[in-house]
Amino acid sequence: MKLKPIEVADILQKEIANINCLSELEEVGQVINVGDGIAKIYGLANVQSGEVVEFESGVKGLVLNLENDSVDAVIMGDDNQVQQGDKVKRTKEVLEVLVGTALLGRVVDALGNPIDGKGDIKSKEYRHIEMKAPGIIDRASVSEPVQTGIKVIDLLIPIGRGQRELIIGDRQTGKTAIAIDTIINQKKAHSLNDEKDKIYCIYVAIGQKRSSVAQIVKKLEDAGAMDYTIIVSATASEAAALQFVAPYAACSMGEYFRDNGKHALIIYDDLSKHAVAYRQISLLLRRPPGREAYPGDVFYLHSRLLECAAKMSEEKGGGSLTALPIIETQAGDVSAYIPTNVISITDGQIFLESELFYKGIRPAVNVGISVSRVGSAAQIKAMKQVAGSIKLELAQFRELESFLQFGSDLDSATKAQIEHGKRLVEILKQAQYHPFSVEEQIISIYAGTKKYLINIPVERIKEFEEKMLSEIKQNQKDILESIKSEKRITEENEQKLKTFLENFVKDFVKID
């Protein structure tokens, strides 16, 4: 049988197509220099920026600099395991992290590996650590509240689901305490088993001491809050590359909940250390330094992270991701580079002051310069009813307070205003790890703003509040239930509340 040349060509093509070629070409380069967590690699001509490479020892690297004849990669782990002359291969992948509900209750590192000794995480879903933020069309306006359980915040600086609210202040002023209290306060919503009220929490520790992270884990476990919380830890002892990646990895975990119609809250503690880690990497990569030696793209570093916080439209599932970034200031200087950057990115800030903290006013929130730009739309009507002019009254009190040092030559109206201000400040104080329900907050603030506390000594305000809330829970539950269901104070309920407070104040003063 004679075959025509064209038939031979067809047969050969079919045979070639049927060959199962198992061998795969790998692009391999070589480490020509390594030090300070940076490896210079020769021979990876086609590698892309942001691609993951794998070193001979199994340690991963992230390519950040592309040059004519070499590339620079940050080592995602111990740089002692990478030696000059080691082979490096391309993975043709970008950084991914495990996501899903299986992560709840776990402590993981910046790459999503468990570090709590509780075994592997049973999740098969991965997500890229840098996803594009939702567009304008995919978003909805902020309309539902995130209840922190902290009176001064829920009343005066309300936070909505999908908002980005900065917590800023000097070291040791209670920034982390506010974040942890907010996580603990979500426990009640999780116990009610209504998915639309639940908020899943993610806490990212960047550049902190391991002992501090261990304390936070212990506190959340004791409060029963770890069941709905993920902790991502990139401590001070870990590579700068891991501290740089940690917030993005945690954000991807939060985006999983947001994109599946659920609600998540993410706390970045803190972004000052994140910027320092990025500055370290940039300087080692020999990128040009700018103001305070930070690289030129340090604004974009945080803006692309915080833009992922959003309230999604109903067409996209109606989920949300709320961000609470934390920034540490030096001697109260909010005009420094990183603080001003993050203030301009976020939708408001809670400013904590050392002076107030040392005076015993805790949480040490400076109400005058703290603001929530979009949260008021999410605040329930009952809160707006009791808040009234409290911000103005507190500002006037702060102004009049300075006159106290000049003695008692003040008119009776000014004295009365100062006494009222002192009681407002006292009623807004709150112990750590002691969140209040919305109804309890409303009752307490109502008593303060309507001047029911004027005859009660300042040092007994806390005792009065505890006894009043205990009494109302036992004998006037209908007042609390009405506020909870109506989300406002009805005329009938207000009358009941007035009668209760008048009688309770009389009895309290009489016992005194």
From Swiss-Prot:
<dbReference type="InterPro" id="IPR038376">
    <property type="entry name" value="ATP_synth_asu_C_sf"/>
</dbReference>
<feature type="site" description="Required for activity">
    <location>
        <position position="370"/>
    </location>
</feature>
<keyword id="KW-1278">Translocase</keyword>
<dbReference type="InterPro" id="IPR020003">
    <property type="entry name" value="ATPase_a/bsu_AS"/>
</dbReference>
<dbReference type="Pfam" id="PF00006">
    <property type="entry name" value="ATP-synt_ab"/>
</dbReference>
<dbReference type="Pfam" id="PF00306">
    <property type="entry name" value="ATP-synt_ab_C"/>
</dbReference>
<dbReference type="Pfam" id="PF02874">
    <property type="entry name" value="ATP-synt_ab_N"/>
</dbReference>
<dbReference type="GO" id="GO:0045259">
    <property type="term" value="C:proton-transporting ATP synthase complex"/>
</dbReference>
<keyword id="KW-0139">CF(1)</keyword>
<dbReference type="InterPro" id="IPR004100">
    <property type="entry name" value="ATPase_F1/V1/A1_a/bsu_N"/>
</dbReference>
<keyword id="KW-0813">Transport</keyword>
<dbReference type="InterPro" id="IPR027417">
    <property type="entry name" value="P-loop_NTPase"/>
</dbReference>
<dbReference type="InterPro" id="IPR000194">
    <property type="entry name" value="ATPase_F1/V1/A1_a/bsu_nucl-bd"/>
</dbReference>
<keyword id="KW-1003">Cell membrane</keyword>
<dbReference type="InterPro" id="IPR000793">
    <property type="entry name" value="ATP_synth_asu_C"/>
</dbReference>
<comment type="similarity">
    <text>Belongs to the ATPase alpha/beta chains family.</text>
</comment>
<keyword id="KW-0067">ATP-binding</keyword>
<comment type="subunit">
    <text>F-type ATPases have 2 components, CF(1) - the catalytic core - and CF(0) - the membrane proton channel. CF(1) has five subunits: alpha(3), beta(3), gamma(1), delta(1), epsilon(1). CF(0) has three main subunits: a(1), b(2) and c(9-12). The alpha and beta chains form an alternating ring which encloses part of the gamma chain. CF(1) is attached to CF(0) by a central stalk formed by the gamma and epsilon chains, while a peripheral stalk is formed by the delta and b chains.</text>
</comment>
<keyword id="KW-0375">Hydrogen ion transport</keyword>
<keyword id="KW-0406">Ion transport</keyword>
<keyword id="KW-0066">ATP synthesis</keyword>
<dbReference type="InterPro" id="IPR033732">
    <property type="entry name" value="ATP_synth_F1_a_nt-bd_dom"/>
</dbReference>
<dbReference type="GO" id="GO:0005886">
    <property type="term" value="C:plasma membrane"/>
</dbReference>
<keyword id="KW-0997">Cell inner membrane</keyword>
<protein>
    <recommendedName>
        <fullName>ATP synthase subunit alpha</fullName>
        <ecNumber>7.1.2.2</ecNumber>
    </recommendedName>
</protein>
<feature type="binding site">
    <location>
        <begin position="169"/>
        <end position="176"/>
    </location>
    <ligand>
        <name>ATP</name>
    </ligand>
</feature>
<dbReference type="GO" id="GO:0005524">
    <property type="term" value="F:ATP binding"/>
</dbReference>
<keyword id="KW-0547">Nucleotide-binding</keyword>
<dbReference type="GO" id="GO:0043531">
    <property type="term" value="F:ADP binding"/>
</dbReference>
<dbReference type="InterPro" id="IPR005294">
    <property type="entry name" value="ATP_synth_F1_asu"/>
</dbReference>
<keyword id="KW-0472">Membrane</keyword>
<dbReference type="GO" id="GO:0046933">
    <property type="term" value="F:proton-transporting ATP synthase activity, rotational mechanism"/>
</dbReference>
<dbReference type="InterPro" id="IPR036121">
    <property type="entry name" value="ATPase_F1/V1/A1_a/bsu_N_sf"/>
</dbReference>
<dbReference type="InterPro" id="IPR023366">
    <property type="entry name" value="ATP_synth_asu-like_sf"/>
</dbReference>
<comment type="function">
    <text>Produces ATP from ADP in the presence of a proton gradient across the membrane. The alpha chain is a regulatory subunit.</text>
</comment>
